């Protein structure tokens, strides 16, 4: 049995509960940060994670509290992150940086701290993962900083983070280390309320 703690900054993630199915998002108007990461209370996302070492592992992230514009997300390792939903986007007060920021258009960018920058590189990706097939997805790539790490996250409207990739090349050896998480299943808000097995779940290795 194996558990994997999720950390979105490094790539985290998964378990089957709700389901996605092949679908195009219902037209709900412009793509906004809130639609790309719908943080309704009780929502849960599960991911299959490839670490490059051993079999895939499972990771889970869920919204555990919503207080006004403040949202707390807890990962299966017990780590919590707090975000604020603002008019401009999704703000992380702990690091004083944006997770997602409007406008959602190719080339838009924002500072993510420690010399790193996030940039929107695509707004029309089609994604096929175990949770389903999704369209009009947005790719955000974060680069810079001393370690040269590149983090790419694909957000799909009315779904959330669907693919999370992190890769880094060792300066001395030139070897690349990579971690990739793909959405296995998800349930939003009331749909997830009846699911009570995510916290602290033990997952059997495939």
Which residue stretches match the model-derived regions?
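C-terminal motif of bacterial Sec signal peptides marking the signal peptidase cleavage site
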Residues: 16-18
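Bacterial N-terminal signal peptides that target proteins for export
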Residues: 1-9
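Residue-level signal for mature regions of secreted extracellular proteins and peptides
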Residues: 12-13
């Amino acid at each position: 049995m194996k558990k994997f703690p999720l950390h979105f900054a490094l790539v985290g993630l998964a378990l089957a509960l709700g389901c996605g199915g092949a679908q195009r998002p219902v037209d709900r108007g412009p793509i906004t940060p809130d639609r790309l990461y719908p943080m309704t209370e009780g929502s849960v996302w599960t991911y299959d994670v490839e670490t490059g070492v051993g079999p895939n592992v499972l990771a889970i992230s869920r919204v555990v509290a919503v207080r006004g514009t403040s949202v707390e997300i807890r990962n299966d390792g017990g780590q919590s992150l707090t975000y604020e939903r603002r008019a401009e986007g999704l703000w992380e007060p702990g690091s004083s940086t944006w997770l997602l920021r409007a406008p959602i258009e190719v080339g838009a960018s924002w500072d993510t701290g420690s010399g790193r920058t996030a940039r929107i590189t695509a707004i029309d990706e089609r994604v096929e993962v175990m949770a389903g097939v999704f369209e009009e997805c947005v790719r955000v790539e974060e680069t810079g900083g001393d370690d040269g790490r590149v983090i790419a996250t694909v957000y799909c409207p009315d779904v959330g983070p669907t693919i999370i990739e992190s890769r880094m090349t060792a300066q001395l050896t030139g070897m690349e280390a990579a971690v990739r998480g793909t959405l296995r299943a998800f349930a939003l808000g009331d749909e997830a309320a009846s699911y009570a097995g995510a916290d602290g779940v033990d997952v059997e290795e495939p």
